[in-house]
Amino acid sequence: MELQIGRESGQTLHKILYVFFICKKSVTFCCMNFVKKISCFVLVLSFLSLTYVFAQDAAIYLWKDVKGMKNEPSVMFMHKAKKSDNTDQKSPCVIICPGGSYHHLGLYNEGFCSAKWFSENGFTAFMLKYRTNESFYNHPAMLEDIQRAIQIVRENAKEFGIDENKVGVIGYSAGGHLVTMAGEFFESHNELKKLGIDTGVSLRPDFVVPVYPVVSMQDDIAHKWSRKSLLGKNQSQVRKDEFSMELNVPDNMPPTYIVVAKDDPVVDYNNSLRLYDSLVKKNIPNCKLTVYEWGKHGFGMVNKEFMKAFHWNENLKEWLKEISIIE
């Protein structure tokens, strides 16, 4: 596979784009195709602006060498592991999926802050800018993107200096649903195979971390905006069941660590409880649910009051040690 890797530069441009990112407003045009192109352009500018704040090592475009997919905007940003010693040792890897109701992406606290923390703790981190409904995408675009990201990481493990047997995923809110799909659908919904891509590597992540995740598409606890953005107009009960993660846990589900706050006002925390119950019923090993009394929604990896009170990232780190991803 020939990787399409770009390196960002130009601090003055980044300063301008950072201001643009903070101030930008959504603009609606009459022509849908034009909106799609403009939305993609705005997203690219937004990501470039954030590189001024969070240095990255490379931008890897997912679909540049795939026939019929070359114009797709999906990209992941690599942050190399910071190693204090033994620089020849392969690092574990994590692919990060920000949330945003499958409509947009929460880049700061859920994306780049996460990448920074994982990088500082010995992981090579890939922050995935997957396609969303803001640019008029629905399923299977999102699942295609995360499966493609896993494929690229594993096929290029030697070049990236990572351990191909320690490739995990973490996702927030709707991104939590996406990484759970990656953990459940790597065989039953192989979207790359449908595109004629023979991966030659496993699409099964080695660990899954859904944080305050969207889980269920069932009417009683579904996050309606995420469901609409993912499924589009076809929201039949069959589709709701198919994409309710608590109903589809396979026997070979990866180890899963679920994090949620009980006072979450956006995504009902019972989403997390249902997923965990399903994991337990399936006897999936090394699964854990951590429910915090408060924290609401969207705390991500920002070192604010919630992080200082509960140190959820350090609790995650201990679990990663327990499952032998890190020492």
Regions inferred by a protein language model and the residue ranges of each:
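Catalytic nucleophile-loop/oxyanion-hole region of alpha/beta-hydrolase
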Residues: G106-C113, L128-E164, E305-A309
